[in-house]
Regions:
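Glycan-recognition and catalytic cores of secretory/periplasmic carbohydrate-active enzymes
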Residues: 1-381
Length: 381
């Protein structure tokens, strides 16, 4: 049953239409409002109203049907296709789809090495934001994976050119700006800070996603070249990332947060689901550099990714959930919020616990990380 669902997900991804190699980031349906027992709810009109669209976490529109193509999202999806091809099954369609995208990606790389942030939905031309950002790092990882599988030099050349741009323009000044820095849950500065430092502290508004993508790309560059400069920059970037990991248990946090990750230097979340994504990379650096602290931090991040789950194994968390949602019972086991303290406030009565669950940014992501680490590194204590 699980394999069937996984294969359905693969088929869905492959069904996304490509336009000159580029492709949409989501499928959605038309919605409408219904009233049940006096309360109003948003409900889908059904799959017969489906449309292709893109993430609305962008500077231009909240409407996913009108949102532009996001290079980062496409590179991430294509990278996952390559990992499936490499690690699970040699489905040639995955490689072909990713390579069609890669050729389009090479065609829009700037002379300075960066890739654009977004492409206009109609003209397919680069838009006005994040055209020299560390989002480029994820495309580096994708291109290097494709080079590993095809041995085509053009992918490697483009990847190293992009990586060097990030090394010279982003890392020295901590310009960790990506879509989530300004156009997701914390929009502070989106009107006047993009590309600029805050005068008060001489820092950019920063998001640790960019740090992760860059540390990951630098590790892949090192693996291909054995050039220690890439490893040194990677460790430097990883250390910045680890500054956003909780290394203590504050008394004003009412669930376990040790090992969990925050998000921005201008937002409130703790125990964010990204810790499940980060854990493998941290452990990889730890094993490569023979640094037990990194390995410990990586496994702590993995464990933290399960902390928000409503289940008997998390008695402290379970108690908090039941305070804020008294109707929770055994049929709700497995429910997990993407983070803790999303609104910037917590209290003993359950404030900060949240109200929704996202499978691939919560319980599913945590389970995936556990299984990947189990496969790669063996039994997890």
């Amino acid at each position: 049953e699980l394999l069937a669902k996984a294969n359905l997900t693969k088929e869905l991804a492959l069904s996304f239409p490509q336009r000159n190699g580029f492709f949409y980031g989501l499928i959605g349906t038309e919605m409408h409002e219904v009233e049940i027992d006096g309360k109003k709810y948003n409900r889908s009109k059904g799959w017969n109203t489906y449309y292709w669209g893109n993430s609305n976490r962008n500077p231009y529109t909240w409407n996913p049907k009108e949102s532009p193509y996001h290079i980062l999202d496409m590179s991430w999806t294509a990278l996952l296709m390559l990992r499936w091809y490499d690690e699970l099954e040699k489905d040639a369609r995955l490689l072909a789809y990713a390579e069609d995208y890669a050729m389009a990606l090479l065609g829009i790389q700037y002379e300075n090495g960066f890739f654009p942030g977004w492409l206009d939905l109609k003209t397919m031309q680069p838009m006005n934001h994040l055209n020299a950002s560390p989002e480029t790092s994820l495309s580096v990882t994708f291109l290097l994976k494709l080079y590993e599988l095809t041995h085509k030099e053009e992918y490697k050349r483009a990847a190293f050119k992009a990586m060097n741009a990030v090394i010279h323009e982003i890392i020295p000044v901590g310009k960790w700006e990506d879509f989530e820095t300004y156009w997701s849950c914390s929009r502070y500065g989106s009107d006047n800070l993009v590309g600029k430092k805050v005068l008060r502290n001489n820092m950019h508004k920063q998001n640790n996603f960019s740090m992760f993508w860059t540390a990951e790309a630098l590790l892949e560059c090192y693996r291909l070249t054995s050039n220690k400069e890439y490893l040194d920059y990677g460790q430097r970037t990883l250390d910045e990332l680890l500054m956003t990991q909780a290394s203590w248990q504050p008394p004003y946090m009412y669930v376990n947060v040790l090992g969990g990750f925050g998000v921005l230097n201008a937002d409130g979340e703790w125990n964010d689901s990204r810790e499940s994504l980060f854990s493998e990379l941290i452990i990889q650096y730890g094993k490569l550099l023979d640094k037990p602290e990194y390995i410990e931090r990586g496994y702590a991040a993995l464990k933290a990714s399960f902390v928000m789950m409503y289940c008997t194994e998390n008695p402290q968390t379970k108690q908090q959930w039941e305070k804020v949602h008294p109707f929770f019972a055994s049929e709700d086991y497995g429910f997990i919020m993407e983070n803790y303290g999303h609104g910037g406030r917590t209290n003993p009565a359950g404030e900060g616990m949240g109200e929704f669950t996202i499978y691939d940014w919560g319980n599913g992501a945590a389970a995936e990380a556990y299984n990947r680490l189990l496969d790669k590194f063996g039994k997890i204590e």
